């Protein structure tokens, strides 16, 4: 059986006893200001050094090199952070389940995180148009907006959450909507 503390301990011994949150940030292909996006998120995260910050690699879209370079530089000077190149599916879901929150702009914040009742701080416009749940807190690119959404997510009471991507006949419903 998977144990997230054992997994974190394998990554870094300090992680097994600490609270943590996950960072999943990908390039915004519509907007070209990925450098400012990652800079503002990382600047905002400096206020949360009492948490372990677990970063994942960005996807391979144009602009991912900028994001990855900034994350690696951040990690060099922030000993409470770790970068994981690739999670296994089960490991990712277990880590997400016990994470204080997920921050970034990943679709995982709209699909898996609500299902696991993990709050999401969604930064920017990459996920614009997706249905929101009670556990998703949008933030603009501004540091003040990001910090405000982090504070809200840390005070989020895990409870029953509306799940937008589950239910009976989901495939038929999606197909019906796509046909219209």
Regions found by a protein language model. Name each.
Residues 1-180:
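Nucleotide-activated sugar donor-binding and catalytic core shared by glycosyltransferases
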């Amino acid at each position: 059986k998977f144990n997230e503390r054992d997994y974190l301990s394998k990554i870094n011994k300090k992680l097994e006893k600490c609270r943590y949150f996950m960072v999943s940030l990908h390039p915004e292909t519509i907007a070209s200001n990925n450098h400012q996006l990652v800079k503002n998120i990382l600047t905002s995260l400096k206020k949360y050094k009492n948490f372990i910050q677990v970063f994942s690699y960005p996807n391979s879209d144009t602009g991912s090199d900028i994001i990855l370079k900034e994350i690696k530089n951040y990690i060099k000077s922030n000993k409470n952070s770790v970068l994981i190149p690739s999670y296994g599916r089960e490991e990712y879901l277990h880590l997400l389940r016990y994470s204080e929150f997920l921050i970034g702009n990943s679709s995982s914040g709209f699909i898996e995180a609500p299902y696991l009742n993990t709050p999401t701080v969604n930064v920017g416009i990459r996920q614009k148009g997706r249905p929101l749940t009670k556990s998703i807190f949008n933030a603009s690119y501004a540091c003040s907006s990001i910090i405000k959404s982090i504070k809200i997510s840390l005070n989020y009471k895990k409870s029953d959450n509306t799940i937008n991507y589950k239910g009976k006949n989901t495939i038929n419903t999606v197909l019906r909507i796509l046909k219209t």
